[in-house]
A protein has these predicted regions:
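N-terminal Rossmann/SDR dinucleotide-binding element
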Residues: 1-109, 119, 471
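Active-site activation/catalytic loop segments of kinase-like enzymes and analogous catalytic loops
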Residues: 686-728, 747-766
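Active-site Tyr-X1-5-Lys
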Residues: 173-205
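Conserved Rossmann-fold NAD(P)-dependent oxidoreductase catalytic core, especially the SDR/UDP-sugar
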Residues: 101, 105-109, 116-124, 128-179, ...
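Conserved ATP-binding subdomain of kinase catalytic cores across diverse folds
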Residues: 450, 456, 461-608, 692-693
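ATP-dependent phospho-/nucleotidyl transfer catalytic cores
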Residues: 555-660, 671-674, 770, 780-781
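Amphipathic terminal alpha-helices
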Residues: 1-2, 17, 40, 44-47, ...
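Mid/C-terminal beta-alpha module of Rossmann-like enzyme folds, strongest
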Residues: 259-333
Length: 785
């Protein structure tokens, strides 16, 4: 897709009049409002009706139902009573000629979205009007043509390619299985042919369009609404691997309106997808956290149950039976629904479109919990979903803290009673909330999560400066446990029961207060390798709200590069830095165990108390571990649980210290210093008493990769030992240190990696297969040594 030049935009207010079809539809009504945001632009809407008054009434009624309410300048809207199936669009000769001579562009938004209708019905509505509209576009003055198509034309089955915006020849009709997609393909072909004859046009391919990002108001008959209603009613959802790149309707409308002002010759195509998609299983989890009771079950079991229930005349999925049940020989007996699972079809590539939208300052709202909550809330208000059984707490607004909250805190932290805080503003950011905190936030609200703020700070004798901080609102322990139990129950009743009945889970119990205490440690070695801690803000419910230095995204190597194989200099900086932190409590185990904030640590007693939980986690993770790292790894977790009494005392016989216990690239950054990168570790809520090698083992699994992992690990293991010796002033025997690394690998496999497998069921952990393979390579290297 060629990018327009800087001066190739139509200046606002210079277009006179455009024609819009489909203005009474879900997207069309929003597109009308978006077009009217352009000053002085007039919009002629072609609307079906008995007469002009009837057509006008239909449009007025549709606009009146928009939420949030809008008040478009209707003096710039002309309603044309017409018919798209007529070769002259149902207009009189005079009205047709006037339209030909007065409009600058045509926006064809009308159409039928139906995932189960036969092609002949869809062709009549989605393809039939194109010849008449294209004749109108070519007649009289030069006009631009804008076709609202669908991203579904890019889903070719079988296929695995990413279809770029300009790859029209790659779209093969015989590989499009969905009749709706075939009808959109046919419409696009007509536009493509017209462009070959000199027409300037744009094709807009949105993904599935969901509710308004502000109100959640959605299309009552779309497939998403029907699917959610069915799963809530059945209390079952299919375990399928669907990527949900849905876009809110208001974003799609604004994007089309903005992109359509680009001036160009020929054809431009845009893919409108959500850059922050969710997965189907994550949506099901969110519904459970919202208060519904839905279990993920194998697709075949769900389909069998649906076959029984869909006989009811008013079942929400009854109109879509063909989509879910009809098996197609040409795709190995899959249903149309199954062809949309990840990996079975090609997918649209939106990188060029996303770049252009970013240049225009347009960002698609993430398909996150707040957006889903608004959409579900609107469905409940509209009677399309029942209210959930459990009421949720209302989230505090992100701007819930102001100058009066920050000023006394910063005065105390910086030791300056004269300090003044100016205007405080929340800062939008991509959330880095931990998975468990995200779950608690979804279930309980209460502002749980990471929020960023910017403020001006004036100090006597110094220049006023801008300060950016992070406010980390912590979930309470019962909230964290409740969220994890809910997630487990979606997948396995036995796993949920194990979480619910384990009185204290080592590492999780007391996590909120523990992180606060760790940040407050008065030790220069820790402070050098952690963000600055300013203190806590008071909360009405005694919920900790930690205020920390904002490191900025530039420092997050993991965020820039992804969690992948790293350069040796950064790995070494992480190893030496965490050794400094390990030195703080190294050799002081008894003293550390007396600290009230430590909670239940990883002792043999605590591990045995949670044995049933470890067993259920190992069993749950076994299929995934076997698929990713081989059958020999799959049963190892369960055997480690059975032999806890034999090998865990070996851990307790070695020197231990305070460890991060979640030490991977998602939880640390690097500061740039003249001496090179310096570690800055955050998110200390899982900190516990353990082997220092445990943090090293997790780090290496994430950053080495399986190839030559053992060879490289030996160097970093020795580097860690020597750094800890220097920092603690204690001699560490090399053989015992090496043996402790093997024990740490076992600990990692037992207590942490299965939790990632659980989260992977809902939010894809792309790193996990590689981490498992690296773990296995390290374990084999350690055993061979």
């Amino acid at each position: 897709m060629k990018r327009p030049d800087a001066d190739s935009r139509t200046p606002p207010g210079t277009r006179g009049r455009v024609l819009l079809t489909g203005a009474t539809g879900f997207l069309g009504a929003h597109l009308l409002c978006a077009l009217l945001e352009e000053p002085r632009l007039e919009v002629a809407c072609l609307v079906r009706g008995r007469d002009r008054d009837g057509a006008r009434a239909r449009l007025d009624e549709r606009l009146a139902r928009l939420s949030p309410p809008v008040r478009p300048d209707m003096s710039r809207v002309q309603v044309l009573c017409g018919d798209l199936q007529d070769e002259r669009l149902g207009l009189s000769a005079a009205a047709y000629d006037d339209t030909c001579g007065s409009i600058d562009a045509i926006y064809h938004c009308a159409g039928l979205v139906d995932w189960a209708a036969p092609y002949d019905r869809l062709e009549r509505v989605n393809v039939g009007p194109l010849p008449a509209l294209l004749r109108l576009a070519r007649r009289g003055r030069r006009k631009r043509f804008h076709l609202v198509s669908s991203a579904s034309v890019c889903y070719l089955t079988p296929g695995s390619a990413r279809i770029t915006e300009d790859a029209h020849d790659a779209l093969k009709l015989d590989l499009l299985r969905l009749p709706y997609a075939r009808s959109k393909w046919a419409a696009e072909r007509l536009v493509l042919e017209a462009c070959g004859a000199g027409l300037a046009a744009q094709i807009h391919r949105p993904s599935i369009i969901v509710g308004d990002s502000r109100s959640g108001q959605s299309n009552s008959s779309d497939i998403v609404t029907r699917m959610l209603a069915a799963c809530v009613g059945m209390r079952l959802a299919p375990e399928v691997d669907l990527v949900l790149d849905y876009c809110p309707v208001d974003f799609v409308a604004r994007a089309i309106a903005a992109l359509s002002r680009d001036r160009h010759d020929g054809l431009r195509t845009f893919h409108l997808l959500n850059p922050a998609p969710a997965r189907w299983s994550e949506l099901v989890l969110w519904l459970n956290l919202y208060g519904y009771d839905i279990r993920l079950v194998p697709h075949a079991r769900w389909l069998e149950r649906l076959g029984q229930e869909v006989r009811a005349p008013r079942h929400p999925l009854r109109p879509l039976r063909r989509f879910f049940f009809e098996r197609r020989d040409e795709v190995d007996g899959l249903t149309l629904f199954e062809t949309y699972e990840e990996g079975r079809s090609s997918v649209p590539d939106d990188r060029a479109s996303a770049h252009r939208l970013a240049e225009l300052g347009l960002a698609c709202p993430a398909l996150d919990a707040p957006l889903i909550e608004r959409c579900v809330g609107a469905m409940i208000s509209g009677g399309r979903l029942p209210a959930p059984g459990i009421a949720r707490a209302r989230q505090l607004p992100v701007n819930g803290f102001d100058r009066l909250a920050f000023e006394p805190l910063l005065r105390s932290a910086l030791g300056d009673a004269s300090l003044r805080v100016g205007a405080v503003a929340p800062v939008a950011h991509a959330s880095r909330d931990g998975l468990t905190s995200s779950l608690a936030a979804w279930k309980y609200g209460a502002g749980i999560g990471v929020h960023k703020y910017a403020m001006s700070v004036a100090r006597r004798g110094r220049r006023t400066r801008r300060l950016r901080v992070i406010v980390k609102v912590k979930p309470l322990e019962h909230e964290l446990r409740g969220a994890i139990v809910t997630a487990a129950r979606v997948c396995s009743e036995r796993l949920a029961l194990a979480f619910a009945t384990t009185p204290e889970v080592p590492g999780f119990s007391g996590s909120a207060q523990r992180e606060l205490a760790v940040y407050a440690l008065a030790d220069a070695r820790f402070a050098r390798h952690a963000p600055r801690f300013y203190g806590t803000l008071p909360q009405r419910d005694s919920r900790p709200a930690l205020v920390l230095e904002d490191l900025g995204d530039a420092a997050l190597l993991g965020g820039r590069r992804g969690i992948d194989v790293w350069p040796s200099g950064h790995v070494a900086a992480a190893v030496r830095g965490i050794a400094q932190v390990h030195a703080v409590w190294y050799g002081r185990e008894a003293e550390l165990e007396r600290e009230p904030w430590l909670g239940v640590s990883h002792t043999l007693r605590g591990m045995l108390g949670a044995r049933e939980l470890w067993r259920e986690l190992a069993e749950f993770a076994r299929p995934a571990f076997g698929a990713w790292a081989g059958v020999e790894l799959a049963p190892l977790g369960e055997s480690l649980v059975g032999a806890l009494e034999a090998w865990w005392p070996e851990i307790e016989s070695q020197p231990r210290t305070l460890i991060h216990n979640d030490f991977n690239p998602r939880n640390f950054a690097f500061r740039d210093t003249p001496a090179g990168p310096r570690l800055c570790a955050f998110d200390w809520e899982l900190a516990t008493l353990g082997l220092p090698q445990r943090d090293l083992a997790e780090l290496l699994c994430f950053v080495l990769g399986p190839r030559r992992a053992g060879e490289r690990a030996g160097r970093y293991l020795e580097m860690h030992r020597k750094a800890l010796e220097r920092a603690s002033g204690r001699r560490i025997e090399r053989g015992a240190w090496r043996a402790g690394f093997g024990l740490a690998l076992r600990d990692l496999l037992l207590t942490r990696l299965p939790m990632y497998a659980l989260m992977h069921r809902f939010r894809r952990q792309e790193f996990l297969p590689r981490v498992l393979a690296t773990w296995q390579a390290l374990y084999q290297w350690q055993a061979a040594e």
